[in-house]
C-alpha cells in the first residue's frame, strides 16, 4: 500500500526545512564562523544531494503520469547536480564560483516544471494552488542563487536563498490531495479528505 502523496510531500518538506535552516544559520553567522567545524561546510550541499537521490524512488513509485514522472526526474537530477556542484566548491575540487549557477538552474527548471505539470487553475483545489504558488516562488527566487554566484558574500542573497527553502517547506507542509483553498473547492475536484 502506498502512502498518500501528501505524506511524501511532508517528508520532503522536512528535508527542505532542514536545508533552509542550515543555510539560514550560515547566513546569520557568516561562512567563516559556520565553517569553523569542517563538517558543517558539507551539511547543506550533502543534504541537497541526498534529497535529489530520494526523489528517484518518488519518481519511480509515486507518479501516475508521464508529466509527473518527468517533473520529479528533473527535480532529482537538478538537486543532485546543484548539491554536487556545491560539494565540489566546498571541497575545493571546483574553483570557479560560477558553479553556484547550478542552483539557479535548479530553481528555474523546478519552478517551470511545477507550473507545467499542474493542469488545473489556481483555485481548483489546494494542491493546484500550491503548485502554482511554489512554481512562481521558485522562478522569482532564482534571483537569490544567481546573486550568490555574482556576489558570494552578499548577506541579502544568502538570507533570501535560505528563506526560499523555508518558504517552500511551509508550502509543502500545507499540501493535501483534495482540500479547499481560501474556502473554495471546485466540484470537479471531488470530496475533501478531511
Which residues does each predicted region cover?
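Juxtamembrane boundary at the C-terminal end of a transmembrane helix
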Residues: 172-194
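Membrane-interfacial loop-to-transmembrane alpha-helix junctions, especially the N-terminal start
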Residues: 30-47, 94-105, 152-161
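Final/C-terminal transmembrane alpha-helix of multipass membrane proteins
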Residues: 158-178
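Membrane-interface helix caps and helix-loop-helix hairpins in membrane proteins
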Residues: 3, 61-67, 91-94, 118-126
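A generic, lipid-embedded transmembrane alpha helix
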Residues: 41-60
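Juxtamembrane "helix-exit" motif on the non-cytosolic side of transmembrane helices
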Residues: 54-63, 114-123, 174-178
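Hydrophobic cores of alpha-helical transmembrane segments in multi-pass inner/ER membrane proteins
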Residues: 12-24, 74-89, 133-148
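Hydrophobic transmembrane alpha-helical segments in integral membrane proteins
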Residues: 1-16
Amino acid at each position: 500500500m502506498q502512502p498518500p502523496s501528501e505524506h511524501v510531500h511532508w517528508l520532503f518538506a522536512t528535508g527542505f526545512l532542514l536545508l533552509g535552516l542550515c543555510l539560514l544559520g550560515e547566513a546569520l553567522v557568516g561562512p567563516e564562523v559556520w565553517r569553523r567545524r569542517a563538517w558543517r561546510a558539507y551539511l547543506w550541499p550533502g543534504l541537497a544531494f541526498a534529497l535529489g537521490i530520494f526523489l528517484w524512488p518518488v519518481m519511480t513509485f509515486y507518479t501516475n503520469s508521464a508529466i509527473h514522472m518527468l517533473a520529479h526526474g528533473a527535480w532529482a537530477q537538478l538537486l543532485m547536480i546543484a548539491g554536487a556542484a556545491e560539494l565540489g566548491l566546498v571541497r575545493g575540487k571546483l574553483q570557479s564560483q560560477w558553479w553556484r549557477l547550478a542552483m539557479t538552474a535548479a530553481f528555474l527548471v523546478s519552478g517551470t516544471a511545477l507550473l507545467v505539470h499542474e493542469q488545473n487553475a489556481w483555485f481548483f483545489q489546494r494542491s493546484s494552488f500550491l503548485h502554482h504558488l511554489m512554481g512562481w516562488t521558485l522562478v522569482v527566487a532564482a534571483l537569490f542563487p544567481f546573486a550568490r554566484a555574482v556576489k558570494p558574500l552578499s548577506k541579502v542573497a544568502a538570507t533570501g536563498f535560505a528563506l526560499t527553502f523555508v518558504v517552500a517547506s511551509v508550502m509543502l507542509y500545507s499540501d493535501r490531495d483534495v482540500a479547499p483553498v481560501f474556502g473554495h473547492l471546485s466540484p470537479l475536484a471531488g470530496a475533501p479528505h478531511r
